[in-house]
């Protein structure tokens, strides 16, 4: 049997895969402080409220453009809590993104960039997948563009109990298991 040639599939998909930078800005929070040692011995011992400044945080991940008008699917944990989202396209253009919706229980998010005629990847029908069929994982692991790995469909209709990013128990139903390498940043 001839080996499977995935070069055309890889070439067709890399243009629709984007790099996402999600920035959470510094915030000031009021917290109840520990009782001051002198208050403990000599005062009322209640402590004082204090202002703390959180550090800005930046997260990275991948996404895929699913419509020519700029809708992108990514993981919720990539954009959760973000104040600013920057989307870098395969052609190195950077656009501002905004969150349209999130689902922490399935770790999915939909974001939008402004523009039109973006390259897309068609969404397939997972019911038509067969165990043992070849699949590609395309993303930007380690902040590197257009990384492609291959594997097979290992199982279908898997269910797993997990904890969503909001701390709630979640039961993800009917996901596809693959042995394609998924590295940090492929999310």
Please give the residue ranges for each predicted region.
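Serine-dependent protease modules
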Residues: 1-187
């Amino acid at each position: 049997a001839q080996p499977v040639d995935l070069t055309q599939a890889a070439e067709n998909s890399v243009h629709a895969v984007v790099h996402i930078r999600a920035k959470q800005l510094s915030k000031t929070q009021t917290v109840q402080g520990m009782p001051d040692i002198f208050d403990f011995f000599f005062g009322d011992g209640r402590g004082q409220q204090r202002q703390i400044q959180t550090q800005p945080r930046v997260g990275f991940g991948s996404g895929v453009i699913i419509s020519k008008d700029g809708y992108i699917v990514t993981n919720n944990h990539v954009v959760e809590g973000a104040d600013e989202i920057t989307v870098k396209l395969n052609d190195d253009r950077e656009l501002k993104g905004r969150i349209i919706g999130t689902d922490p229980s399935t770790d999915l998010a939909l974001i939008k960039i402004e523009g039109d005629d973006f390259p897309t990847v068609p969404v397939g029908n997972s019911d038509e997948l067969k165990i043992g069929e070849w699949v590609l994982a395309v993303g930007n692991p380690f902040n590197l563009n257009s990384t492609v790995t291959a594997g097979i469909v290992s199982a279908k209709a898997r269910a797993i109990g997990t904890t969503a990013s909001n701390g709630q128990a979640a039961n993800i139903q009917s996901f596809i298991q693959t042995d394609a390498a998924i590295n940090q940043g492929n999310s």
